[in-house]
């Protein structure tokens, strides 16, 4: 298991964190892909069995990474992913992307919706229907884009669960689902 802090993360200076301005998601995905390729080059890593997963922005990065690489990730799990920055909180998004009117090309280039046909690998997408952070619409729009691109995928929906997807047996069910998916697809 590797955790990669790509460009845009804090703690490495202004240039590093601001490099994603108006193109949030592109460089971060490139960094995940580069890290996976590097890890796959190590003798003790099976490069044909690399997966990627993330929650929220990490789910978004999973979708972007799987759509911007060919053959790098055998499978991926995207939990509560943003699929179009137009659907997300403007206070957060516009700090990095400006408004859609000011940066329309940036919004198009950074949308997994526009890259659904390029998705490579097995995908499990998970969302809660009561998510008030990354609205469920993101998952619905993305699943429709995958269907229109004739891409097969798996989806797990949690009724009345918010962005954290927890309560009663939910979190156990979620991680069991992720584990089972990875067990089936990483062989």
Question: Where do the PLM segments sit?
Answer:
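Acidic beta-to-alpha connecting loop that harbors the catalytic carboxylate
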Residues: 129-132, 160-162
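Short beta-strand immediately N-terminal to the catalytic nucleophile in serine-hydrolase-like folds
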Residues: 52-54, 79, 126
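Short beta-strand/loop motif that positions the catalytic acidic residue
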Residues: 119, 125-127, 131
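Conserved alpha/beta-hydrolase "acid-adjacent" motif
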Residues: 132-141
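Mobile cap/lid helix-loop segments that gate and shape the active-site cleft of serine hydrolases
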Residues: 31, 75, 81-121, 148
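Short glycine-enriched nucleophile-adjacent loop
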Residues: 59-71
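C-terminal catalytic histidine-bearing segment of alpha/beta-hydrolase fold enzymes
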Residues: 124, 140, 147-187
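Cap/lid segment of the alpha/beta-hydrolase catalytic domain
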Residues: 1-56, 60, 83-94
């Amino acid at each position: 298991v590797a955790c990669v802090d790509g460009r845009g993360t804090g703690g490495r200076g202004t240039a590093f964190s601001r490099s994603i301005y108006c193109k949030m998601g592109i460089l971060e995905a490139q960094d995940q892909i580069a890290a996976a390729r590097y890890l796959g080059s190590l003798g003790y890593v099976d490069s044909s069995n690399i997966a990627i997963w993330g929650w929220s922005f990490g789910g978004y990065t999973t979708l972007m990474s799987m759509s911007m690489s060919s053959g790098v990730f055998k499978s991926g799990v995207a939990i509560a992913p943003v699929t179009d920055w137009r659907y997300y909180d403007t206070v957060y998004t516009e700090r990095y992307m400006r408004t859609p009117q000011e940066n329309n090309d940036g919004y198009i280039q950074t949308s997994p919706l526009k890259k659904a046909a390029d998705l490579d690998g097995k995908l499990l997408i998970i969302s809660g229907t009561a998510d008030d952070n990354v609205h469920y619409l993101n998952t619905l729009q993305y699943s429709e884009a995958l269907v229109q691109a004739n891409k097969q995928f798996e989806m797990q929906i949690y009724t009345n669960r918010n962005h954290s997807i927890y309560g009663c047996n939910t979190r156990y069910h979620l991680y069991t689902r992720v584990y089972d998916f990875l067990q089936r697809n990483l062989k």
